[in-house]
Amino acid sequence: VSGRVLDENGKPVRHSLVEIWQANAAGRYPHKNDNHDAPIDPNFTGGGRTMTDEHGRYQFLTIKPGAYPYPNHPTRWWRPPHIHMSIFGDGFMSRLVTQMFFPADPLNDVDLILQSVPDARARERMIARQVPMADMPMLNEVGFEHNIVVRGQRQTPFGV
């Protein structure tokens, strides 16, 4: 997962802390309060942190998380694969929290959290773009690009 943190004018937000946390490939978080019966992956920590560079770029090497049932809802609906992200930086007053979703996942259309964002274009800004991993061809995997805009009309939805 890679991308850039940008301001409302498309300029990089340099030296911001980007933090991620996510479920493992089976859809389970590595903490004691996750009651999903999927297996724990002992080799997966579930999160990471990095600083944006001079161009506002960030990058994480991780796995695609699995879907999981949302336990606190009467119908136990399933959350689509997603990665939680937070951004800390000098240009804004508080921690910004959002989620990154994967393209073409059928659960995106029925996810109560993603669908709580009323503007369809804003929801699209929460869905990453699939890109080749040109810098790591030996992995034979794909990457996902997700740019985060911290304010303005094209702002990434936060607080979801």
Q: PLM features: residue spans?
A:
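Beta-strand-dominated extracellular/periplasmic modules and repeats
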Residues: V1-I127, V131-V160
